[in-house]
C-alpha cells in the first residue's frame, strides 16, 4: 500500500524539480547573472518552504485532522461547518482554486518533461529549437491521458507507485552525484541565507522570487486531499524518503549551478534547465523517459483529485448532479465525463496560449496559493474549537504570514498568465455559490404533507370514475429521503388543472451506497393500495436505469397483494399482464415573475437553472428517455405578492 501511496499523492510534488530552478534562472536573467549568494539563497528558501509548508503544516498538523479518514478542503469543511455559515466561503474559494490549478498541472508537468528531448544528443538535430514539435508531442500525450480516463486506473495504480518510487530514487541519486562535487551548498540549510537573499541586490526578481519558491510546494495540498485514498500511516511512512530525495535533487542542481555559473557556453542559453543539464548525455535518456512518466502520473493524480472534489461538491449541494461512472470496484475510482471534457479542453487551451513550460510555469501556482490560504483558515477554526486556542493563533499567524507572502509574490504572475487561473477560479466559485444559494431558496419553500392530510383526498380521486385515468401508474422522482411523508410538489402535480387519476401513485427516491453492488429497496404504502413511497438503494457500480427496478418492485408488490393486479385491454411493450402502463413525471422549479425574492436570489436561481440545463438531464441519468417522461415546470413560491389590480374602463 505504501508503494501505491507514492503514485497517488507524490506525483505533483515529484515533478516540481523539473521546472522550479529553470523558472528561478529565467527570473534572474540567466545563469550568468546568478552568483553564489543567489544559489544558496534560493536553495535555502526552497528547503525551508518544503519543511514549513509541506512537512509541518500538512504532514504534521493537517493530517491529524480528518473526517472519518478523509482529508481535503471539502472534508475539512464538512467537519467544521457547524461553527458558522461563513466557513462555506473560504471552502468554496479554496476548492474552486484547486480545480482551476488542476488545469495547469498536466500542461506544466508533461511539457517540461517533453522539453527534455531537446537536450538529448541523438534528437538534438530534430528537437533543438523546434517548439512546435515539442508542443505537438505534449498535446498527443495529454489527449491520450484524458481519453483513457473512462477505463479507470485501478489496474495500473500499483505500476504508478512503482514508477514514482523509481523516479524519486533517480532524483536522489543524480542529485547526490552532483552534490558530491560541492558539499558547500549544504550551507543553504541555514535559513539566514534565504532571508538575506530575499532582500539583497543579488535577487533580480525581488519578492516575486517567492512565487518561484512556491512551485516547490505545489503538491502539498494533494497530500492532504488524498489522505483518504492511501491512509495517514502510509504518508507518514513514505514522506521522509520523498523529502530527502527532493532535497538531494534541488541541492544537486544548486551545486551544478555553482560549478557552471561562469561557463560561457551557458551564458546565452535560453530556457536553461539545470535539472537536465546536470546529467551526462547518456543519463538524460533515462531522465526524459522517467520525467514523462512522472508528469503523466502527476497529471493523473490531479485529474482523479478533480473528480473527487467535484463529487464532494455535489454532495454538499454546491454543484449540479453530474453523470458519474465507476470504472473500478472501489468508489474512490470514479470518472465524470463532463469534468474530464472540461479539464481536457482547458488544458489544451493553456498549451495553445502559453506554448511551453517556461511560460506555463510563469502562470502556475497563483490559484493554489489561494487554496493553501483557505485551508489554513479552516484548519485554524478546527484547532480553535478543539480547545487549543493559543495553538490556533500561533498556527494562523505563522502560516498565513508565509502564504500571503507566497500569494502577493505570485501576483506578479497575474499579467503573465495567472489571470487565466484566477478567471477560472472565479467561474467555478460562481457556479458553487449560485448553486448553493439557489438550493437554499428552493429548500426554503419546500413543503411536505403528512399521510393524514393527503391520503383521503387521493382516495377520493382514486375512486372517482368520472375522471379518466391519466395512467395506471404515475411515478414521481423525488430527492426527499424521508419515507413517512409526501412532497407537496407531487400533490400539486396530481391535482393540477386536470387531475392525474391513476390506479397507483409512486414517489421514488434513489440513493447511492458505498457498497459497489448494493441492490435493495424499501416501500411505505401508508395503509393504502394506491399510494407508495419507494426508496431504492443502489451500489455505486450499479446502473441507475430506474425503469427496470420500478417494474420489478411493482411485480413484487403485485405478487404480495399490496398492489392490485392491473389488467389492460390493449397490448403493452413489456407484455406483463399484471402491471398497467407507467408514466414518469419529473418536476422542475421555475422562478415566478411575481415571486418576492431579492435580486441576488433571483440571479442565483437563474444561473442555477441555466447550469442545470447545460449539466444534463435526469431523463438521461435514470434511463427514462425511451419512456417519454413528462417534465413539469412548477412555480417557485417565495412569498409571492399579489399583482396590482386592473381597473375596468
Curated annotation (Swiss-Prot):
One Pfam family recorded for the sequence: K_trans_C
Segments passing through the bilayer: 1-21, 42-62, 84-104, 126-146, 159-179, 195-215, 235-255, 286-306, 334-354, 364-384, 390-410, 414-434
Assigned keywords, A-Z: Cell membrane, Ion transport, Membrane, Potassium, Potassium transport, Symport, Transmembrane, Transmembrane helix, Transport
Protein source organism: Bifidobacterium adolescentis (strain ATCC 15703 / DSM 20083 / NCTC 11814 / E194a)
Annotated PANTHER family: K+ POTASSIUM TRANSPORTER, OSMOTIC STRESS POTASSIUM TRANSPORTER
Cellular compartment(s): Cell membrane
HAMAP family for the chain: Kup
GO cellular component assignments: plasma membrane
Species lineage: Bacteria, Bacillati, Actinomycetota, Actinomycetes, Bifidobacteriales
Role played: Transport of potassium into the cell. Likely operates as a K(+):H(+) symporter.
Catalysed reactions, as listed in the record: K(+)(in) + H(+)(in) = K(+)(out) + H(+)(out)
Bilayer topology annotation: Multi-pass membrane protein
Gene coding for it: kup
InterPro entries linked: K+_transporter, K_trans_C, K_trans_N, Kup
Protein name: Probable potassium transport system protein Kup
Amino acid at each position: 500500500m505504501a508503494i501505491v501511496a507514492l503514485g497517488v499523492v507524490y506525483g505533483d510534488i515529484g515533478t516540481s524539480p523539473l521546472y522550479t530552478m529553470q523558472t528561478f534562472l529565467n527570473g534572474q536573467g540567466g545563469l550568468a547573472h546568478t552568483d553564489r549568494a543567489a544559489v544558496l539563497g534560493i536553495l535555502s528558501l526552497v528547503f525551508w518552504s518544503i519543511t514549513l509548508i509541506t512537512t509541518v503544516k500538512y504532514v504534521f498538523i493537517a493530517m491529524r485532522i480528518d473526517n472519518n479518514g478523509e482529508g481535503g478542503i471539502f472534508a475539512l469543511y464538512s467537519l467544521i461547518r457547524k461553527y458558522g455559515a461563513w466557513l462555506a466561503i473560504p471552502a468554496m474559494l479554496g476548492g474552486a482554486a484547486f480545480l482551476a490549478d488542476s488545469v495547469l498541472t498536466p500542461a506544466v508537468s508533461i511539457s517540461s518533461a517533453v522539453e527534455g528531448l531537446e537536450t538529448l544528443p541523438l534528437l538534438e538535430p530534430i528537437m533543438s529549437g523546434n517548439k512546435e514539435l515539442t508542443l505537438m508531442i505534449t498535446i498527443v500525450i495529454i489527449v491520450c491521458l484524458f481519453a483513457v480516463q473512462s477505463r479507470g486506473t485501478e489496474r495500473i495504480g500499483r505500476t504508478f507507485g512503482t514508477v514514482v518510487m523509481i523516479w524519486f530514487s533517480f532524483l536522489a541519486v543524480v542529485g547526490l552525484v552532483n552534490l558530491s562535487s560541492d558539499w558547500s551548498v549544504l550551507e543553504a540549510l541555514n535559513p539566514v541565507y534565504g532571508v538575506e537573499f530575499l532582500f539583497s541586490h543579488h535577487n533580480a526578481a525581488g519578492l516575486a522570487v517567492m512565487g518561484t519558491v512556491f512551485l516547490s510546494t505545489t503538491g502539498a495540498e494533494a497530500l492532504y486531499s488524498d489522505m483518504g485514498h492511501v491512509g495517514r500511516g502510509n504518508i507518514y511512512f513514505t514522506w521522509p524518503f520523498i523529502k530527502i530525495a527532493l532535497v538531494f535533487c534541488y541541492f544537486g542542481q544548486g551545486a551544478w549551478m555553482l560549478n557552471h555559473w561562469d561557463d560561457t557556453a551557458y551564458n546565452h542559453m535560453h530556457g536553461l534547465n539545470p535539472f537536465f543539464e546536470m546529467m551526462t548525455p547518456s543519463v538524460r535518456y533515462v531522465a526524459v523517459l522517467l520525467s514523462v512518466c512522472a508528469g503523466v502520473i502527476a497529471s493523473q493524480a490531479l485529474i482523479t483529485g478533480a473528480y473527487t472534489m467535484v463529487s464532494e461538491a455535489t454532495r454538499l449541494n454546491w454543484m449540479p448532479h453530474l453523470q458519474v461512472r465507476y470504472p473500478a470496484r472501489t468508489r474512490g475510482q470514479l470518472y465524470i465525463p463532463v469534468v474530464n471534457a472540461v479539464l481536457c479542453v482547458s488544458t489544451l487551451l493553456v498549451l495553445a496560449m502559453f506554448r511551453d513550460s517556461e511560460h506555463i510555469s510563469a502562470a502556475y501556482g497563483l490559484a493554489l496559493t489561494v487554496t493553501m490560504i483557505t485551508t489554513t483558515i479552516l484548519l485554524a477554526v478546527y484547532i480553535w474549537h478543539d480547545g487549543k486556542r493559543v495553538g490556533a493563533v500561533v498556527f494562523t499567524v505563522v502560516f498565513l504570514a508565509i502564504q500571503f507572502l507566497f500569494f502577493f509574490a505570485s501576483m506578479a504572475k497575474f499579467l503573465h498568465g495567472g489571470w487565466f487561473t484566477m478567471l477560472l477560479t472565479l467561474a467555478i466559485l460562481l457556479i458553487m455559490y449560485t448553486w448553493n444559494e439557489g438550493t437554499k431558496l428552493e429548500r426554503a419553500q419546500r413543503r411536505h404533507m403528512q399521510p393524514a392530510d393527503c391520503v383521503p383526498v387521493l382516495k377520493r380521486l382514486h375512486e372517482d370514475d368520472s375522471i379518466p385515468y391519466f395512467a395506471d401508474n404515475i411515478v414521481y422522482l423525488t430527492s426527499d429521503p424521508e419515507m413517512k411523508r409526501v412532497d407537496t410538489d407531487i400533490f400539486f402535480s396530481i391535482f393540477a388543472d386536470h387531475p392525474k387519476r391513476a390506479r397507483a401513485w409512486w414517489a421514488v427516491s434513489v440513493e447511492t451506497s458505498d457498497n459497489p453492488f448494493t441492490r435493495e429497496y424499501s416501500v411505505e404504502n401508508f395503509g393504502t393500495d394506491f399510494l407508495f413511497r419507494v426508496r431504492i438503494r443502489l451500489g455505486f457500480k450499479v446502473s441507475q436505469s430506474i425503469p427496470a427496478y420500478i417494474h420489478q418492485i411493482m411485480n413484487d408488490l403485485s405478487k404480495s397483494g399490496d398492489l392490485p393486479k392491473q389488467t389492460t385491454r390493449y397490448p403493452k411493450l413489456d407484455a406483463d399482464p399484471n402491471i398497467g402502463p407507467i408514466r414518469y413525471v419529473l418536476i422542475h422549479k421555475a422562478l415566478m415573475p411575481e415571486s418576492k425574492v431579492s435580486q441576488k436570489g433571483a440571479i442565483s436561481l437563474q444561473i442555477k437553472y441555466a447550469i442545470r440545463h447545460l449539466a444534463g438531464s435526469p431523463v438521461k441519468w435514470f434511463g427514462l428517455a425511451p419512456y417519454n417522461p413528462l417534465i413539469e415546470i412548477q412555480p417557485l413560491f417565495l412569498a409571492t405578492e399579489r399583482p396590482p389590480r386592473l381597473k375596468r374602463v
